Amino acid sequence: MRYPKFFLLLFVSMILFSACKPSFEQKTSQAIQDVMNEFKAVGVSAAVVKDGKIVYNESFGYKNLNTQTTLTNDDVMRIASISKSFTATSLLQLVDKGVISLNDDVSDLIGFKIRNPHHPEIPITLKMVLSHTASIRDKEDYFTLDHLNPAVYGDCEESYFEYKPGEGYNYSNMGLNLAGTILEKVSGVRFDDYVRTNVIHKLGLYGGHNIDSLDANRFALIYTNKNGEYVESKGAYKSRSEDMPSYVFGYSSPIFSPTGGVKISAHDLAIYMMMHMNGGAYNGVRIISEESAKAMQTPVWKIQKEGEEQYGLCLREFIDFVNDEKYNVPGSYPIGHTGGAYGLNSIMIWSPADGWGIVAMTNGFTAVEGKSILKSLTNAIYEACIKE
């Protein structure tokens, strides 16, 4: 008769042990907060995908320091350069429809001559622009195409590097603003409206480029650390209403920042990420073809010198980023993109091999020498929530 009593005690012990053992949600939340403390972060929103679903979504800290309003999962942030992938995704829709080709000369698409004056005989293609191999140099003001327009700046020599288009890599915000303008010109729909209708809303998400079409109450304010104090970066959510009367269709698209202007929550960005993880479709809704999804994720440029990236079409491979050797060998690199502007840092990263994905964004932090807050957040979340 002792055996039933023994098993009862064993069962009770197991229940008590499991009750005391932190859940993966608790471990993940603690890991994120530890990173926040190290970087004195204003706020962090994060979402984790495993096995085709969001298994974790939490927000910490503040959306507004002045009012001490806490950050929630419904709040949106300007995600900076992850936005480039939204522009590329939209253009790949037109490629799928046969309207344009990645090998098209962008001069034919935009309506004026785009040529590197050092190599005027070489056409600059859409594929080059989306992979940062077009030899286009960022100017201080890349929110206008004037610096690429011969009618304004002649041969525009200062807007180009000396290497041949397609034979070098330099990250170019100007190039992606050109790509967004091409989307507008070719589709016949204003840039921000096209992306919102055909990508964001089609996936059932909330967000977009145009400040004036979104609820300002959901914006998580973005801060930069200046001399030890956090200062709001008001330019991050600047209204474009004053620019609209002079808006030139097919030319003024850069004011919406195709290169970095999407505002979205971590939760909804994770759903967008799952669409790319699933080869261009999510929940029965196809956004781009499997062929186009693969093209975006396949490096056009492979690292040849320090500072370069393994870059596809507005998506990149992460090398020596996740602290697990299995993801640091060719064929196993995670894919995604990062963003950084106005004090915000953001990341969207996933493993095609193992089906996990992480989204994290912070609306302000203090730099720590020799460390990256995005790498720290990614690895903290990976260790707590994903690694077995």
For each of these PLM feature ranges, what is it?
Residues 117-335:
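Short, surface-exposed loop or secondary-structure junction motifs
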Residues 337, 345-364:
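Short, well-ordered beta-strand elements
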Residues 18-19:
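C-terminal motif of bacterial Sec signal peptides marking the signal peptidase cleavage site
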Residues 304-309, 320, 360-388:
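Short, gly/Ser/Thr-rich active-site loops of penicillin-recognizing serine hydrolases
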Residues 1-7:
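Bacterial N-terminal signal peptides that target proteins for export
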Residues 61-63, 237, 364:
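A generic structural motif
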Residues 24-77, 150-159:
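Short, conserved catalytic-motif segment at the N-terminal edge
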Residues 37-45, 66-128, 161-174, 257-260, ...:
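Short active-site loop at a secondary-structure junction
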